[in-house]
Amino acid sequence: MCYKLWVFCFGIGILFGPLLAEGKLLWEDCVWIGMERNGSLGLEQVRSEIFPILSREKWKQYLPKLGVHYFGIFSKNPEQIDQEYRDVRLQIQQLLYDGGETEREKQKLEIRKLIHSEEKKLLREKIFKSISIAYLSFQKRQLVDSIYQLRSERYKLEQQKRKKEMELGLSSKSESEWRKVWEVEFQSKWIHSESAKKLAILDLYQTMSLDPNVPISLAGGFTERIRLFDPSSDQMIVNENHPLRRKTRLQIELAELEEESLENDWKPKLVLGGYVGKNGNGGFPLQNEIYGLSVGVQANLGGTSFQSNTQNGIQSEGNGIQRIPGYGPQPVGPGENSFQSGSIGLFDDLGRNKKIFDSKMSLLQAKADWKQSEISFFSQVHSIEIKLHELYQKYNLYLESTKSNLNQHRSKREENKQGLISEIEYLKSEEEVFVGLELLLEPYFQYISTALELVLLLGENPFDNRYYRLEPNRFPSDLSKILADWKDLPQNDIRKINEPIQKKPYPFLMEDPYETR
């Protein structure tokens, strides 16, 4: 998916602003805030700005190189005639042929840019996952804590009732002692639940890059916004363009280009040059026009370098000086002048064989990494899928068990009202529902977290996919119905919160225009 940055800014302003004003943050909001504030992601965004600069530099190698050169000689000796010479010329050089090396360098730069793009995507996924896991963990702890709180309120009411029964002698001492043991265990669990909730919100603050003193409030009703699907209903399709897989393929392409560069370094570089200007033996303005052409050849043959230069020029009048590379200035008279120079450096690149060996090893290493990465990727996907099926089955198992416990508890409640069972039996029945709810929440949130991990590997929308979907409006889910029955409240009396009319686009819209998924 590829979107422009203004879509992101527009989405933030329109969709994110009202929720901040209300102080209620949804899952999407937490992800947006965390990704926007993450320092590592911002740093990688700045680093990516170097690639357009380097690309422009590579393009400049196709352009002619212009330069203005000045050369002067002055000699004033008591026993000789004073000499004065000045030379000003405009020089131009154009690369005609380099064996395709410049084009390969451009391709290498483009591949490095794409590799960096995939690394940024992997970083986004890591940040997205860490924020989402922290958010889901807090939602779970919040639900567990609310269940403990409701249980505590009920117990206080029951405690007042039992106190009167004790005063009237209607309750035995053994029942009172059992309730004290139960109360200690319950309070211990509740203390642990409150601590876990505080740690979960701190973890969420950390993943969102927020100061713990910043006041935020998360919207409730999470179980009424998300709809779970059977993971075995659709056949899984592995994402060919996952950033991890694309990165390893691009690294192979880069290693192949590096090897190709070394294999083609024997091809000569051909440079055509020319100059035009004036020189003279007096002061300015200069009198004599000069111009000429030059041809340069460079090559590397098995670690032995070869250079050759040829220049033909014309001196209109007077005497001039030509500067020959490697030989210094030489005087020339009016008319045509030329020079040829050449040099051979025998085995002056002794490390060439090692460079070739290193490039071959880099290519073999890149292919080995790709193969291992593919095996690990498929293994990870299938292992997560197996775990996902297990969690979904556990969730349904605990769901049915909790429904059964809840129905039995309703019967026990009626029997307790009629005095047919003791308070201990009633408390045990309530304890079964209470423990069942805790057991139910564990696979429920684990399923969503595991499905999120798999969705990121498959390249699907993390808010709307084959495993779950965030709905724009609340709906009565199985879990929310059980929680409503547990609270003993009618479904219509559940407090509503403002929901978004439209689901928010997921944060991979923050990708740069050149990045595709």
Where are these regions (language model features)?
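Periplasmic alpha-helical coiled-coil/stalk elements that build and connect Gram-negative outer-membrane
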Residues: 120, 126-246, 251-254, 259-265, ...
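Membrane-embedded beta-strand positions in outer-membrane beta-barrel channels/transporters
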Residues: 89-91, 135, 294-296, 340, ...
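Residue preference for a single heptad-register face of alpha-helical coiled-coils
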Residues: 29, 36, 43, 87, ...
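Positively charged n-region of N-terminal signal peptides that target proteins for export
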Residues: 1-5
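Bacterial N-terminal signal peptides
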Residues: 6-17
